[in-house]
Amino acid sequence: MNEVCEFLKKVGVYYIATVEDGEPRVRPFGTVNIFENKLYIQTGKKKACFKQMDGKVAEICAFKDGTWLRLTGTLVNDDRVEPQEDMLNHYPELKGMYKVGDGNNAVLYFKNAKAVFYSFGKEPKTITF
């Protein structure tokens, strides 16, 4: 999981795919953090993507320096204060838009996750968590 998190942080902007009414939705994201041995991302509860993610399977795709990552798993919303604080401490630039416990700040962690690193000419590397 640490390798996945570090890769996504290096990439900076990754893309997350969800489904809405049977149609694919892909958007850029940039938050990723490990808290209590779980990989978290962050968004707003008022956004359509939150409804597409909460309790559902999503997939992240990221590419850097000839290596790409596909991370698939179920996203679980965590309404506790502690993971919200931790995420905002790692991304202080978000504090202007989100506050801990504001009813909009959403941190979601991956459950039953499978990450596969691919690179041309190399065997894929799979990590589950």
Predicted stretch roles:
Residues 32-66:
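A short mixed-secondary-structure module that forms the rim of ligand-binding clefts
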Residues 25-27:
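Short, well-ordered alpha-helical segments enriched in acidic and aromatic residues
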Residues 67-129:
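Charged, gly/pro-rich active-site loop segments
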Residues 6-20, 58-62:
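A short, Trp-centered hydrophobic/proline-enriched beta-strand micro-motif
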Residues 29-30, 70:
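Conserved beta-strand in the GNAT
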Residues 11-13, 37-39, 55-58, 103-107, ...:
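Short, surface-exposed beta-edge/turn micro-motifs
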